[in-house]
């Protein structure tokens, strides 16, 4: 329920609030700007699961990236020197893992560091073990896949991975 006029007590930080019937007379102009770092390599629709109804953008610095039936599903906001990301729901899928990874990098204002060790296929992942000079690229799918491995933001190599393969490489 609402407390002090807000459903989400951190609505100023999150950039969203929930309509519960007390602010129906207020105009809510939810315009979508789908271009954002968080969704740059997301293909197709994002699965928000059951999601959340009646969520609208709130404040001065929010950006609605995705919405459904005029209700916000993915919203970014700047607040003071910080950033926040609101997701209406996020069931597990490889694409949602990538979405969450990108959201974390954006919220931390570390977008430039995301491709220190990076693969561009959402069904693959990479881990670096700098102390021993190794990288592992993992195919998380039951199908063969192609991916590009980036190190320090530069394309290192193109890889073809067998289903569920883990490939070790030298850094």
Regions inferred by a protein language model and the residue ranges of each:
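A conserved amphipathic helix/loop scaffold
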Residues: 1-171
């Amino acid at each position: 329920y609402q407390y002090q006029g807000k459903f989400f007590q951190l609505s100023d930080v999150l950039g969203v609030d929930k309509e519960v019937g007390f602010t129906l007379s207020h105009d809510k102009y939810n315009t979508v700007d789908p271009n954002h770092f968080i969704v740059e390599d997301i293909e197709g629709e994002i699965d928000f699961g059951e999601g959340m109804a009646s969520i609208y953008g709130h404040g001065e610095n929010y950006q609605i990236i995705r919405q459904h039936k005029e209700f916000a599903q993915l919203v970014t906001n700047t607040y003071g020197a910080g950033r926040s990301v609101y997701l209406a729901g996020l069931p597990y899928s490889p694409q949602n893992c990538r979405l969450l990874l990108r959201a974390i990098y954006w919220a931390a204002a570390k977008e430039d560091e995301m491709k220190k060790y990076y693969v561009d296929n959402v069904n693959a992942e990479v881990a670096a073990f700098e102390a021993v000079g190794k990288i592992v690229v993992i195919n998380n799918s039951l199908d063969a896949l192609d991916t590009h491995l980036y190190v320090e933001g530069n394309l290192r190599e193109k890889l073809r991975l067998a289903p569920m393969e883990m490939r070790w490489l030298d850094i």
